[in-house]
């Protein structure tokens, strides 16, 4: 089990990303736009850099919904490999069967 502080930190990051998403998209559009003046592009770059680090979606980490484990998480299920295996063995995951050949 991951520490509660780590789970809460990740939750806080998700909220921060959602809060700044629209503004970040606008600033990135200005930076990429070649028709915008160099001054406007520079100001957008500086404004983007002044935003909190956690406003970037790249800093979010996928975690297991049950244990909070940061590694070995399957995106499709949102579960860590251990908990996914346990759920599959119980038959809780429809269509998922243990490989046998």
Swiss-Prot record:
UniProt-listed SUPFAM superfamilies: Glucocorticoid receptor-like (DNA-binding domain)
Any one biological process term the GO annotation gives: translation
GO molecular function: rRNA binding; structural constituent of ribosome
GO (cellular component) term, any one: cytoplasm
Keywords: Ribonucleoprotein, Ribosomal protein, RNA-binding, rRNA-binding
Gene3D superfamilies for the chain: 1.10.287.1480
One of the Pfam families matching this protein, by short name: Ribosomal_S14
InterPro entries: Ribosomal_uS14, Ribosomal_uS14_bac/plastid
Lineage: superkingdom: Bacteria
Family per similarity comment: Belongs to the universal ribosomal protein uS14 family.
HAMAP family cross-referenced by the UniProt entry: Ribosomal_uS14_1
Subunit structure: Part of the 30S ribosomal subunit. Contacts proteins S3 and S10.
Functional note: Binds 16S rRNA, required for the assembly of 30S particles and may also be responsible for determining the conformation of the 16S rRNA at the A site.
Protein name (database record): Small ribosomal subunit protein uS14
Species in which this protein is naturally found: Pseudomonas syringae pv. syringae (strain B728a)
Gene that encodes the chain: rpsN
């Amino acid at each position: 089990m991951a520490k509660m502080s780590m789970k809460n930190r990740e939750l806080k990051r998700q909220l921060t990303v959602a809060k700044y998403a629209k503004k970040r998209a606008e600033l990135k559009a200005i930076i990429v736009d070649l028709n915008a003046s160099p001054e406007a592009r520079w100001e957008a770059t500086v404004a983007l850099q002044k935003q909190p680090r956690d406003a970037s979606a790249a800093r979010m980490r996928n975690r297991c919904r049950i244990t909070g484990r940061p590694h070995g998480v399957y995106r499709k299920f949102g579960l860590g490999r251990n908990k996914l295996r346990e759920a599959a063995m119980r038959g809780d995951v429809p269509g998922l069967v243990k490989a046998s050949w």
